[in-house]
Amino acid sequence: MSGRDNRGAGGGGGGHQPLSNAMGKLKEKLTRVGDELGYHRVESNLSTSNTATSLDTILPEDPFLFPQVSPQRHPQTVRTQRLLEDEPPLSFRPLLEDDDINEPPTQQPHRSPLRASGSLELTPLPPPPTSLEIREHRDRQQRGAQGDELQRSKQSLKGSRVSFERRDTGNSNTNNNKAAESSDEDSFEEKRTGFQQQKATSVDHKGILKDLKHILANDNRRQFQAKKHVSLDVKGTRFLQDLLKESSSEEEFHKTRREFQGRKHQSLDPRVTFKLDKVLQGSSTDSDEEGEDAEHKRLIHRPKDITKPVIIDLKDLESESDEDFLTSRQHFQQQRSISTDSRKSRRLYEMDEMGNKRGENIRHAVPFVRQITEDGKPKLEVYRPTTNPIFIWTQVLAALSVSLGSLVVGFVSAYTSPALVSMTDRNITSFEVTQDAGSWVGGIMPLAGLAGGIAGGPLIEYLGRRNTILATAVPFIVSSLLIACAVNVAMVLCGRFLAGFCVGIASLSLPVYLGETVQPEVRGTLGLLPTAFGNIGILLCFVAGSFMNWSMLAFLGAALPVPFLILMFLIPETPRWFVSRGREERARKALSWLRGKEADVEPELKGLMRSQADADRQATQNTMLELLKRNNLKPLSISLGLMFFQQLSGINAVIFYTVQIFKDAGSTIDGNICTIIVGVVNFLATFIGIVLIDRAGRKILLYVSNIAMILTLFVLGGFFYCKAHGPDVSNLGWLPLTCFVIYILGFSLGFGPIPWLMMGEILPAKIRGSAASVATAFNWSCTFVVTKTFQDLTVAMGAHGAFWLFGAICFVGLFFVIIYVPETQGKTLEDIERKMMGRVRRMSSVANIKPLSFNM
């Protein structure tokens, strides 16, 4: 130990010589190897005066291979204490272009902590990394580089977005010109989509608002809102007057507004905006100032009673006129900008696209606001454009003509109620009318109506709706004159049979004509007229019968068809019948008369032709055999059941023999007055039923109707029973009238209109025509049975027995409604047919048409 220490601490010469020789050999070896490999050697600072020697090498490229060296220092020196000559060299790197060969080391060599004692510290290199560690290290480096690249891409994208927004908004006029000159709409749409995607990713709302305000040449926010919301938001128009004051002229304001609208429509829809941009250029580059002023005044001073819709097709937007641009912009606004519901706006646009392909516009478009009036102030006039303006007067004339025929039908139906009283009076009548003959006078009319209903179907197909109705006017007159001039019962029966035959034809043809001529928008209102006029005819017969005998009343009945006959000559045949006969030009003329000469009837005409073609394809030769199929029997049975319980409730017995019933009841109120009261209630109850039928539901009203009729019929039966066999009921003379009023109200709410309505709802479209004829014929058959047998029932069972029988039938009808009748309120015909039959067919043209019913 002391020897080694003495050597280590010894003086200069002897102890250092072997070390110097070894280091010299090592240096030469490293130099030779480096020259062979093409590496640059950095001069080492070999000091013979120190106990340790340094070799300076440059930091290699990959710091992972030499973790003891920090990668932030370049170039760096690495001190290696190696003394053995057979040790491998430490580190070299290739010579770089920017390396300075003569550059001295920037850091002092690392001295061994044993330097003072003259000893050397041997520090071996760490073991070289495995291939797996090298691969993982390089993967981490690659991911780090990708992350840096992604961050730089985000920064670049943000800068590009801001630059793109400013270019697209600030230089919108240039972009519009380029878009208008280019015919490649796909490129325009791609540009718009990219702009929207970049704009949607932005969270810098203040920057977007600033760019939008930059569009308006640095206008303040109030002006921006005023221009943006003009003709879109009614509230925004209050800024219009202030905006006009700030503009030097109205022309300048309109020019600025049009330019703004054109820019604002940018990137909303390329197919429309692409062409609006062209129109904008044409409208804003008009060099003729006088022509522009005249055109502007013509646009501003528009008529106040604008009712004709603006019909615009995309192909018409190529026009360069200011008027075309203005109307195009309005049409575009009403589809997109008024509604705040984006889904609704898209649906409106899709509807319009479909309509343009078919040559049609939206029937119910969104209302839009006329922008300014003559004095520049906002005028909030809203109108709703449709496919065709409703030219109401011709349709009212058609409905009135048909309704006068309905009035005649009502008068004829109620004739026997007041007429039989005077007809059976030998002091008034020159011939005798027995009780059996009287029952035939009342019952033959429904029997003839059955025959007329069967014959009416083929007649309206071969002669036409109008001609068939017109053909009934003269027989109505003849039948009334035959009754008025009768000298025996046979003439009265002939007149009643002829009148009943005409009633059967009219009850089928009148609603068909009305349904095929009136537009859907007013069909509900005008469709009420025939029923109302029919009840007016009943009331007129009751009132006139109070003052006239049967002969004079028949003369009045002969006069009623005259205005009906005259008006029927003024109206045309239905367009649908002309289409079914292949007379397209006649159908076009009929539509022009009904819809107005200025209306576009081509879309409706094409719809009629398509509907007729579908009906022809679905038509079969054996339509009556279709009724016997299992799927069709259920709806047909329900319809026939409703007709049965409607007539077996005794309504026509009450209507036909009202005066006689009150006379037999011994009421304290005059029988004729009671009859008039019943007629008034019957007339008013029609409107009550129409109001409630779509609110309360069909089945609820049928329940109420059944219960009301059951109670009143049993009370009436009890009254007549007490009058014939029991205590004195003279002080209850008001009871029959009260029961009749409640009975009529109950019938009119439910079993009066609903069987006819549900007949059109539940019958399948394929058999609707033939099934409706069967149901109508069955209804007339039941009417004949009731009216013919009522007086026989009163003789055989007494009045109380007849009313109790009708009440019992109504009680059974209540359970029929509960078990079998479906609820059809608020359901489409397709849904009802799907539920009833499991399939859906195209609904026919008379889906909502029902034969006339005025409580018969």
Curated annotation (Swiss-Prot):
Positions where Phosphoserine occurs in the chain: 247-249, 319, 321, 844-845
UniProt GO BP: trehalose transport
Keywords: Cell membrane, Glycoprotein, Membrane, Phosphoprotein, Sugar transport, Transmembrane, Transmembrane helix, Transport
Sugar-modified residues: 427, 549
Cellular component per GO, a single term: plasma membrane
Native source organism of the sequence: Drosophila erecta (Fruit fly)
Alphabetized PROSITE patterns for the sequence: MFS, SUGAR_TRANSPORT_1, SUGAR_TRANSPORT_2
TM region positions: 390-410, 440-460, 473-493, 497-517, 528-548, 552-572, 636-656, 673-693, 700-720, 740-760, 767-787, 801-821
Primary localization: membrane
Protein name: Facilitated trehalose transporter Tret1
Family: Belongs to the major facilitator superfamily. Sugar transporter (TC 2.A.1.1) family. Trehalose transporter subfamily.
